């Protein structure tokens, strides 16, 4: 029998539903790794839209309805949180830190991996490494390798994960990457575009609350602000934060730079002041970042050479909603403009909205800070003193 012409062979493969393996040059393009030097690109909140696994632990893949991942950069560490929702609305979460030793390193090691199920946290013993691959701005491709097997995980940034047609169109590219990495394509997980997550509702409900303030509109955050409600997690200053009495923030915007001053008064009337300058981060992330700051306590100034990321959310004219991730932990901070911060009934009525925003952002609501409406600040009183009338 003579050789089958190439075009006939391709037609036969198409009829049989068989795909030709990706060419080496195509694999080279798809598998370009993200190094430590460029790891800022993985920061953010991500929704798993496609995955395939070669693993003995099938329970991790079976009955999965959604998986939501948060990557927070803290200096040389990537804080990793993965929340998996299964059929029946049961949740399993994983927590770890990722690290790489050199700027050119392409693999990140998992440290202190923990698993949480039904409120019980326990160590999850798996010596794993992670590799990220270059992809589109709102996409994340990640390969996990550990004792339990290998996983290829394809994500879309939270907020751009619901267009089912776009996700379907991208599946062919995901499958090519899997084949390039040597995965067996059997029954991939495919997100349906609508399922909720463990810690929050899908963005139909949260979209209104989490609209970010962009660089173009940053002037709206300028002013003097009083903290009226806040929640934190993974805080390195949790003891001090529990003793917080008031927090007063001054923000001034000049040529795209936010000059930030925070004055915190503790319950023993001692004060801590933090100052830094923030600039806009990557356009697609709508964040503002700083790389250093100064902390003053009892007249002693300490220079902090640490990274922090801030995101502001659209809200009312005299309101400020701010999410902070960095050296001090992860905080949601709700402010009222100085002068409209004292109406306790109004503040109480707004607490439900603050809690909804916290849940949308993945915070556990435990013991929030709530301003009492009257306590003074480090540098001034909460209310101007009323002078007695002259006879």
UniProtKB/Swiss-Prot annotation:
Main localization category: secreted
UniProt signal peptide: 1-20
Residue spans of the Sequence repeats: 24-202, 203-391
Xref: InterPro entries: Calycin
Sites carrying sugar chains: 54, 63, 97, 234, 268, 277, 307
Compartments reported by the entry: Secreted
Keyword Ion transport in record: no
GO biological process terms, semicolon-separated: response to toxic substance
Cellular compartments per GO CC: cytoplasm; extracellular region
Modifications made to the protein after synthesis: Glycosylated.
Keywords, comma-separated and alphabetical: Glycoprotein, Repeat, Secreted, Signal
GO molecular function: toxin transmembrane transporter activity
Subunit and partners: Homodimer or heterodimer of PSTBP1 and PSTBP2.
Function according to Swiss-Prot or TrEMBL: Binds both saxitoxin and tetradotoxin. May play a role in toxin accumulation and/or excretion.
Name of the protein: Saxitoxin and tetrodotoxin-binding protein 1
Origin species: Takifugu pardalis (Panther puffer)
């Amino acid at each position: 029998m003579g050789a089958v012409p190439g075009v006939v062979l391709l037609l036969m493969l198409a009829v049989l539903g068989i795909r030709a393996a990706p060419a080496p040059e195509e694999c080279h393009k798809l598998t370009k790794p993200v190094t430590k030097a460029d790891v800022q690109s993985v920061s953010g909140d991500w929704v798993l839209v496609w995955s395939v696994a070669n693993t003995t632990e099938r329970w991790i893949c079976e009955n999965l309805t959604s998986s939501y991942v948060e990557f927070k950069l803290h200096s040389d560490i990537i804080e990793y949180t993965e929340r998996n929702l299964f059929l029946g609305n049961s949740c399993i979460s994983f927590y770890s830190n990722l690290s790489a030793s050199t700027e050119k390193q392409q693999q990140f090691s998992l440290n202190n991996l923990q698993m949480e199920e039904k409120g019980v946290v326990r160590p999850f013993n798996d010596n794993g490494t992670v590799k990220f691959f270059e992809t589109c701005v709102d996409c994340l491709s990640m390969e996990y390798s550990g004792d339990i097997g290998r996983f290829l995980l394809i994500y879309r940034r939270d907020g751009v994960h619901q267009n089912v047609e776009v996700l379907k169109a991208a599946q062919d590219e995901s499958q090519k990457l899997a084949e390039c990495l040597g995965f067996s394509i059997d029954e991939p997980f495919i997100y349906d575009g609508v399922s909720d997550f463990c810690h929050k509702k899908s963005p139909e409900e949260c979209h209104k609350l989490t609209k970010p303030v962009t660089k173009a509109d940053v002037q709206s955050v300028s002013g003097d602000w009083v903290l009226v409600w806040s929640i934190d997690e993974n805080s390195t200053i949790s003891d001090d934060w529990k003793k917080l009495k008031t927090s007063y923030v001054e923000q001034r915007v000049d040529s795209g730079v936010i000059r930030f001053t925070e004055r915190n008064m503790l319950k023993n009337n001692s004060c801590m002041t933090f100052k830094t300058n923030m600039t806009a981060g990557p356009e697609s992330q709508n964040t503002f970042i700083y790389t250093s700051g100064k902390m003053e306590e009892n007249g002693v100034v300490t220079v902090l050479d640490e990274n922090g990321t801030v995101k502001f959310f659209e809200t009312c004219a005299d309101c400020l909603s701010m999410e902070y991730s960095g050296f001090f932990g992860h905080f949601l901070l709700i402010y009222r403009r100085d002068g409209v911060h004292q109406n306790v009934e109004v503040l109480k009525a707004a607490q439900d909205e603050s809690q909804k925003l916290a849940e949308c952002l993945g915070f556990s609501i435990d013991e929030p800070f709530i301003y009492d409406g009257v306590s003074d600040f480090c540098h001034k009183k909460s209310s101007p003193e009323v002078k007695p009338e002259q006879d």
